[in-house]
Design a protein with these regions (language model features):
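Short, flexible/disordered intra-domain loops and linkers
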Residues: 17-27, 116-123, 248-251, 320-325
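Conserved catalytic-core segment of nucleotide-activated headgroup transferases in glycan assembly
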Residues: 23, 27-30, 148-151, 158-267
């Protein structure tokens, strides 16, 4: 690695309110995890979060501001060696200012912007004018975004992209579950069916349902087929979150789900938005998931870290949970039935296995820290 000194690093956030929850989306979590990774570097980087909006920075921020300080752009624009634009975009004027003083500017792409942009165009979703910044020193793209958006970024921004590792940490999850039973970790519960000897399971589907990438329909079909095989003896209820608007206002959605056995027999509920840790702790034994072009997600790690059975098709973390390939619903059903019948036999071993598999993504992982220092060196010492 090219020799690198300690750097003053800023990571952008774009606050919309003074007490904005970190569970609104994954962006602020991403900024915190990346900041923690750089703080763990043996080089001793100085790291701060840089807010790009006019929202005031107060003690209402939902993280430890002594550990992860946040500042206004104008207050730190002369005190940065590197600015990583992650959660809030800077303007053309701000870009010119940083470039004039020699600050390196990195675009950290953690969203499927190609898909989001074409959906805005096709479905007239409000996006607003788009500022295409072509003055970056590097474009870093996380693995799950590469397939859909890498060439979109590189063409518009006139710079090759660099795939960078995905980073996570359980700190936000642990802060949220501290007061929950068993600190939010899975425990077998309920009464065993006297005929089968098994405890009926509570299923959950928690896709955002705001685009085609993470939608609830395939998980619903997996749950339906498993219900047809096992019935109420094995499945006590299915909750589908972020779906009340679909169940109330989408004729297409209603026409499909109304004839499902699990719906007709009153075993399914379509509810609103919930934060993941509390919903898992209070209402869930098994999570069923499906994605299309976004095969790594913090949600996957939150479910598995705390030991919940996870039926999914995310091939970039296929070692987690109970995996099925692509849209192979039959395998998804088999995996769900296996979890219903056998997960509780070794739930502690399962949780330990999940945490071991997630270690390679942690902000404290020495190999990951070294990779990011090498990435910084390539930008700062080309």
């Amino acid at each position: 690695m090219t020799k690198l000194r300690a750097l003053r690093i800023g990571i952008t956030i774009g606050l919309r309110s003074e007490s904005e929850s970190i569970w609104v989306n994954g962006i602020k979590q991403n900024a915190l995890y990346l900041a923690k990774l750089f703080q763990h570097s043996p080089l001793g980087h100085s790291v701060m979060l840089v807010n790009t909006t006019t929202v005031a920075l107060t003690d209402a921020l939902p993280w430890d501001t002594k550990r992860f300080p946040a500042r206004r752009f104008d207050d730190v624009k002369d005190a940065l060696d590197v600015l990583i634009e992650l959660g809030g975009q800077i303007s053309d004027e701000q870009t010119r200012y940083l470039k004039a003083r020699g600050t390196k500017l990195i675009s950290y792409c953690c969203g499927p912007e190609y898909v989001q942009m074409i959906e805005a165009m096709i479905f007239r979703r409000v996006s607003g004018p788009v500022f295409i910044n072509q003055q970056y020193d590097a474009i870093w793209v996380i693995p799950q975004v590469m397939e859909t958006s890498a060439h979109f970024f590189s063409t518009l921004r006139r710079l090759p992209v660099r795939e960078v590792p995905f980073v996570w940490d359980p700190m936000c999850l642990q802060a949220s579950t501290r007061r929950l039973p068993f600190e939010g970790e899975y425990r077998p519960g309920g009464y065993a069916n006297p005929r089968t000897g098994r405890r009926p399971k509570r299923l959950a589907v928690m896709e955002p349902n705001i685009d085609v990438l993470k939608f609830c329909l395939y998980p619903l079909l997996i749950a339906e087929q498993a219900f047809r095989i096992e019935g109420g003896d094995a499945i006590v209820h299915l909750h589908v979150t972020n779906a009340d608007h679909l169940a109330r206002h989408s004729p297409e959605f209603i026409s499909i789900v109304k004839d499902l056995d699990i719906v007709r027999m009153g075993k399914a509920s379509f509810v609103g938005r919930y934060d993941t840790p509390h919903f898992l702790s209070e209402h869930t034994d098994i999570v069923i998931s499906h994605q299309w072009g976004l095969a790594l997600n913090y949600f996957h790690f939150e479910v598995c870290w705390n030991g919940f059975a996870f039926i999914h098709n995310a091939h970039l973390c296929r070692e987690l949970g109970y995996f099925y390939e692509g849209n192979d619903i039959e395998t998804g059903v088999r995996q769900l039935l296996h979890a219903i019948r056998h997960h509780d036999n070794d739930w502690q071993g399962y949780r330990a296995k999940q945490r071991k598999a997630i270690l390679r993504f942690l902000a404290s992982n020495l190999g990951l820290i070294s990779q990011y220092d090498e990435l910084l060196a390539d930008v700062c010492n080309p």
